[in-house]
Amino acid sequence: MNKKSIIGLLLVGVLTFMTSCADMFDISSSRVVYDYDHTLGSSADSVYTTVGILHAFQQIADRYVILGEVRGDMVDINKNTKASLRNLAEFNFDEDNEYLQIRDYYKVINNCNYLIAHMDTTIRHNNERVMTDEYVAALSIRAWTYMQMALNYGKVVYYTNPITKEAQADVSKYPSYDVKELALVLIPQLLPYMEYKLPAWSDLQADGAPVTSELFPPIQLILGDLYLWLGDYQNAWLTYRDFITDNPNSLMRAQTGSETTTFTGYMPLGNGQVKTDNRMTGRSFIATNFPSYVNGLNGILGGKGEAITVVPMQESTEDGTVSEVPGLFMSRQNTHQLNGSALWQELSLAQDYVLGAQGQPTGGVRGYSYLSNKGDQRINYYVREMQNEEDEFEVIDKFVGRTRTTGTSETYTIGYLTLYRRALVYLRAAEALNCLAEQQHDGAKAVQAFGILRDGFDILFPNGSIYKAELQPYTLGVHARGCGDVYLDTAKYVVKDAVIAEFYGKEVEDVNFTDTIHYVEDRICNELALETTLEGNRFTDLVRFAQRRGADYLASKVACRKGTENRDEALYQKLLNKANWYLPTK
């Protein structure tokens, strides 16, 4: 690998300082000053430098979704798919592929390094350090970016000083880390800042609209992810648990607030749209379009919002980076390049939709029934049937925020891409707890981990506990978002030997502790697909599960994109070799 070529390209435009902020992401060459020895000694310096980092961060946001989903099992290519995407899906990695440009990641890294190296965090105003928030933000973005690079490329060249001179670009002096080695380096760096605030600016827009801290990955969640990849499941579980219990508004709540009424589904979509399904009143749609990322964040990240961290995208290239993702999945003329896979449809249809009986419970027990042939309903929110003069076809409108028509062509845009949201934290907490159950040979913890899917988070803690007091009542299990009143189900969506035996096609008496752990793990893996599909996590989720279960776990899923009866044997054999999972560096 030619490491020098990777980072040497950063010498053009190492860092940007904005001289004004009419549009926070407009960093054109006529408005940029480069000063490699400049000390960031004012709050304005720190804010505008951080904005420069966010601009660079935008440029890798699409990559997060595309690399994470096109290589996974829930997305498939079609006749329109361009060569670069097709090669990704088939794991034929050409160094000239537009999606493999590692320099864009190092641009983010180098900008963060510059801010961290030059910011004066000792400056105080009213006895408060005024630039610490931006310092922590740079730490968080740098750590998250390094983690993504290690996951995608297998190893990452690691450096912490800004490269501003050609002599510094000889990176043979720098170490290369895989994700576990990287975790051992990053965790001690991040731990001292776990309780620090991220920036929450309020004076950059003429109308005073705030730019919230949700533009930055929380240190606590990055730590949770690093612990999870490292295999430190005790600390991973505690970190995720503490984030959820310390942030009560990060809980998914039942919309009704009563155990005797029907829970509603809750589907977070792109650009601030939310679709809900209330079976008592019929389907309703709540949709709010946000033309600017600043105003949009107020709505989507409010007290009841789903998103935790987002990357705002623009509607026009004149304003900044426009996401390619919506147009890859959506078209009215059957020109889209990516589809949901047949395996996604199979998985969704295999679920049981549970409908609680109406009225008051009898004898303290509420009845329920299964709705036949319904399956998980989340896929129906995301997939739209279309028809033109020639074809009937399906598209995915999960990412479409706005549509712009020019003549016969249409352009689809999205207001933001999501890095962290509540359901994802729930599911990673469940994964960590189940892995901890295996380490400690504690079946009760495995049942608790499954409970996060089935019952919600508050059931994990007894009444009167320090955590219970902070939790909202009647939190919603993740699986309920697509499958109804699953908390009532005592026959199918449960951890019982008979259910586990049927799940794996074995005799009840042969079910053992390992089967229980694997059953819960498989349910979590399936739920990650059902809940977070198309959002960028899928392939690396499969890699993480395969670290515990073997290469076949990943290979067998990805090779069955076209359905379990249509396994791609050549692709399966290729993916049994873990070296083929990772991207080449240019």
Predicted regions and their residues:
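Membrane-proximal, proline-rich intrinsically disordered regions
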Residues: 21-69, 237, 554, 560-586
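Surface-exposed intrinsically disordered loops and tails
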Residues: 179-182, 196-207, 251-299, 359-365, ...
